[in-house]
Amino acid sequence: GEMWLRGDHYKWRCMRTFGIDEKYITGDASYYEKYMKFAEILPQLVGNPIYIWCALELKRYFDIDEPLTAANAQEIYDRTKKLITEKHMTRRWCMEHSNVRLVSTTEDPIDDLRYHKALNEEKMFTRVITAFRPDKAMFCANADFAAYLAKLSAAAEQPIDSFAEMLTALEKRLQYFQQITGTTVSDDGIPYFNWADYTPAEVEGIFAKARSGGKLTQHEIDQYQSAFLFEMARIYNRNHYVMQLHIGTYLDANTSHVKSVGQSTGFDCCDDAAPVKGVGELLNNLTTIGELPKTIIYPLDGTKIETWAILAAGFCDNGTKAKVQL
């Protein structure tokens, strides 16, 4: 039960859809009870990738061909529990037997990467790296922006009293990530993006205003985020990073439930706003100065894939296959 359901908010969403009480999803019920509740609704997920994945896992790891249902849930529970014990099926065992050669986590620039350091000291079949995710430094309108800058300052061991100093601190942390895990990828989440022209002086003023808790206009937010993504892309380029843009994130849609059970528990969605023009201007401005890094765009809205693919194809580069891709 724990192997299947702990932290798996995709399964949690399905269970909520079929009216399962939250007690059996994120609540204090035992993992055995949660597993039995999940078995009740799994047959109704035919057509959902989760149904296919569950069948694949039962076959691949336990050689079980029967579909899991409420009727055979106890029998399958007993069989799998016995095999898990006999084969010592740890997380590492599962990754190795699935021939997983590389896993990437995603971490904030302030993370000390202590667990990555520990993994580096062990000989593992699977290599573990991390993506560099600086979102909290981009969201200048957030109430905790100043507090986050203080944490970033401590992690980078330098003062941050300006936008320029913040960029220096982020680059130091990016290089630290590269040193510890060998990573060469970013992970930038963009719920909304509209390119807005700016001057360095304007951005410094916006930074100071945000840091002091001032209320920003939407235009100021657009200017700051334009400058942030532009300068971070330049940092990625000179450090040979691939820039990954997750576009259209709509987090915590059900705020009352998020307050009750926490973030990343199955209440994130995709927005239908496709800032193609804004991202296009970002890519164009980077191309103009010859500093566009390799870029992967992840549009969360599946209906806009064609639009994004056409944009990506417009930024080819001599000698580089699909420099911008989906």
Question: How should each PLM-predicted stretch be described?
Answer:
Residues 1, 242-252:
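Histidine-centered catalytic micro-motifs
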Residues 1-239, 291-309, 313-326:
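Metal-cofactor-binding active-site regions of metalloenzymes
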Residues 252-255, 305-306:
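Flexible glycine/acidic-rich beta-alpha junction loops that bind and position SAM and/or redox cofactors
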Residues 258, 289-290:
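Acidic/His metal-coordination segments adjacent to aromatic residues that form catalytic metal sites
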Residues 258-266:
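Short glycine/proline- and charge-enriched loop/turn segments
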Residues 268-280, 301-309:
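A general structural motif
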Residues 282-288:
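Short, basic/hydrophobic alpha-helical segments
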